[in-house]
Amino acid sequence: MEQKNIRNFSIIAHIDHGKSTLSDRLLEHSLGFEKRLLQAQMLDTMEIERERGITIKLNAVELKINVDNNNYLFHLIDTPGHVDFTYEVSRSLAACEGVLLLVDATQGIQAQTISNAYLALENNLEIIPVINKIDMDNADIETTKDSLHNLLGVEKNSICLVSAKANLGIDQLIQTIIAKIPPPKGEINRPLKALLFDSYYDPYKGVVCFIRVFDGCLKVNDKVRFIKSNSVYQIVELGVKTPFFEKRDQLQAGDVGWFSAGIKKLRDVGVGDTIVSFDDQFTKPLAGYKKILPMIYCGLYPVDNSDYQNLKLAMEKIIISDAALEYEYETSQALGFGVRCGFLGLLHMDVIKERLEREYNLKLISAPPSVVYKVLLTNGKEISIDNPSLLPERSKIKAISEPFVKVFIDLPDQYLGSVIDLCQNFRGQYESLNEIDINRKRICYLMPLGEIIYSFFDKLKSISKGYASLNYEFYNYQHSQLEKVEIMLNKQKIDALSFISHKDFAFKRAKKFCTKLKELIPKHLFEIPIQATIGSKVIARETIKAVRKDVIAKLYGGDVSRKKKLLEKQKEGKKRLKAVGSVQLPQELFSHLLKDED
């Protein structure tokens, strides 16, 4: 295929605006694709994506399109819409020349729409605005056009109108893609230069790499070098996705495809790396994409300690397909060996935990998530803490700083007052208020990340009846009056349950934490005191009463002294159990603790 007939583009949008459905419609227009094979969310290949109805992983496919008897090759990359997976979008854009910016006509522009539009502008990509769901009764097409005009400065009559579900406007959209998105500029005769934008682990092939070839040509048996790791491998097989894996003899400049090279050393493959010929020492690496740092950290521990080695192997494999995931090994006094992982948000954390349990057959306990605090010690040294249990004693701390994020909330006018109150309750600092269109506003607050990772998003959705959308980005670190609250069960500190809270909210949260633990931990044969402490001071307490075994049930009649003897024996046994007995924590304990504190 000549380069002038190739188009590389992504579909970007806010979550649930119809990206995957539009991808399905474009697939139907591909020559040679059998419609009987089509199913909803065709490009969402993970079971968890289909169950949740969201896209988690980017997916690249090749489409053969015929327009006016001219053949074209589309390389479409379907991207996620949730704020936690912005890094997947940034990787997709590095492999494209243009994007379709999709907006739901019933919901209008939302937080992630604006964020994704800015990402495309930063990458100097051609943006085609598309309004979806135009056949819905509550579609507000004119207002959505006005919003897109204000955001991008585009002419209203140039905006594509489609209904992906009803297959309306798709032919016109395809013609617009051909007319507006430029073809790739690479040259086949130049030395090989390709961007590795995604990868995953196959138990038979090793690491399978997804690449965009910018210059040159890649063939089976070619030797290639990863610039960052300086590793050399020989290509075993290569091809494209249609969306099924198809083998090819070569990939050339402008193509988006995959290759396998028997790569078993997982650390040799880094997403964002540049691939060149093995003897090429002069080609400079591509810009790749911006590395995104984790926002929250959480410990994952196997329920059965014998699964620890399996967890280590699973983490090594899963990180290949998730460039934003970070982890290190750690030990908890209460939960044993595990890994401490860095995630981009709570949804990212839930997805990784669920993938580990499903794909690698592990049963895991997750500790409450935490953010990274910067601690200035009295000796002048500054340290970073992502685990509350590692916070030094108060006497050794001069100051603690916590991360603040800039939060953008798009919402209808009628919920503005309630959402402002919510932000204030979460220690928000007002920044700005702007009008999106006649009925919608965008407010901006500076908020502590540690406050919003728990229940802020759920409360926002509840207050706004689901109409508010949220996006956030790291802003800075600010000094705060924070305290470490430690939880003791049966007078033993449980390090995995420690948390850091602002001193104004410490008592209230500790009290609710203890109450929840009392509800979640099953009764034992001995009484269990639950205490929340700051330093040596107990600030909250609950008690789980002992379950009573009826030791005198087997007696009938007889001397009362026999009954007393059995009751005294039970009393002594419970005293011993209380001294040496261990408290069994249920697997679902920590996930329930993360839910709304009200």
From Swiss-Prot:
<dbReference type="InterPro" id="IPR000795">
    <property type="entry name" value="T_Tr_GTP-bd_dom"/>
</dbReference>
<comment type="similarity">
    <text>Belongs to the TRAFAC class translation factor GTPase superfamily. Classic translation factor GTPase family. LepA subfamily.</text>
</comment>
<comment type="function">
    <text>Required for accurate and efficient protein synthesis under certain stress conditions. May act as a fidelity factor of the translation reaction, by catalyzing a one-codon backward translocation of tRNAs on improperly translocated ribosomes. Back-translocation proceeds from a post-translocation (POST) complex to a pre-translocation (PRE) complex, thus giving elongation factor G a second chance to translocate the tRNAs correctly. Binds to ribosomes in a GTP-dependent manner.</text>
</comment>
<dbReference type="GO" id="GO:0045727">
    <property type="term" value="P:positive regulation of translation"/>
</dbReference>
<dbReference type="GO" id="GO:0043022">
    <property type="term" value="F:ribosome binding"/>
</dbReference>
<dbReference type="InterPro" id="IPR006297">
    <property type="entry name" value="EF-4"/>
</dbReference>
<dbReference type="GO" id="GO:0003746">
    <property type="term" value="F:translation elongation factor activity"/>
</dbReference>
<dbReference type="Pfam" id="PF03144">
    <property type="entry name" value="GTP_EFTU_D2"/>
</dbReference>
<dbReference type="Pfam" id="PF06421">
    <property type="entry name" value="LepA_C"/>
</dbReference>
<keyword id="KW-0378">Hydrolase</keyword>
<dbReference type="GO" id="GO:0005886">
    <property type="term" value="C:plasma membrane"/>
</dbReference>
<keyword id="KW-1003">Cell membrane</keyword>
<dbReference type="InterPro" id="IPR031157">
    <property type="entry name" value="G_TR_CS"/>
</dbReference>
<protein>
    <recommendedName>
        <fullName>Elongation factor 4</fullName>
        <ecNumber>3.6.5.n1</ecNumber>
    </recommendedName>
</protein>
<keyword id="KW-0472">Membrane</keyword>
<dbReference type="InterPro" id="IPR000640">
    <property type="entry name" value="EFG_V-like"/>
</dbReference>
<keyword id="KW-0342">GTP-binding</keyword>
<dbReference type="GO" id="GO:0005525">
    <property type="term" value="F:GTP binding"/>
</dbReference>
<dbReference type="InterPro" id="IPR004161">
    <property type="entry name" value="EFTu-like_2"/>
</dbReference>
<dbReference type="InterPro" id="IPR027417">
    <property type="entry name" value="P-loop_NTPase"/>
</dbReference>
<feature type="binding site">
    <location>
        <begin position="132"/>
        <end position="135"/>
    </location>
    <ligand>
        <name>GTP</name>
    </ligand>
</feature>
<dbReference type="InterPro" id="IPR009000">
    <property type="entry name" value="Transl_B-barrel_sf"/>
</dbReference>
<feature type="binding site">
    <location>
        <begin position="16"/>
        <end position="21"/>
    </location>
    <ligand>
        <name>GTP</name>
    </ligand>
</feature>
<dbReference type="InterPro" id="IPR013842">
    <property type="entry name" value="LepA_CTD"/>
</dbReference>
<dbReference type="InterPro" id="IPR035654">
    <property type="entry name" value="LepA_IV"/>
</dbReference>
<dbReference type="Pfam" id="PF00009">
    <property type="entry name" value="GTP_EFTU"/>
</dbReference>
<dbReference type="InterPro" id="IPR005225">
    <property type="entry name" value="Small_GTP-bd"/>
</dbReference>
<feature type="domain" description="tr-type G">
    <location>
        <begin position="4"/>
        <end position="185"/>
    </location>
</feature>
<dbReference type="InterPro" id="IPR038363">
    <property type="entry name" value="LepA_C_sf"/>
</dbReference>
<keyword id="KW-0547">Nucleotide-binding</keyword>
<dbReference type="Pfam" id="PF00679">
    <property type="entry name" value="EFG_C"/>
</dbReference>
<dbReference type="GO" id="GO:0003924">
    <property type="term" value="F:GTPase activity"/>
</dbReference>
<dbReference type="InterPro" id="IPR035647">
    <property type="entry name" value="EFG_III/V"/>
</dbReference>
<keyword id="KW-0648">Protein biosynthesis</keyword>
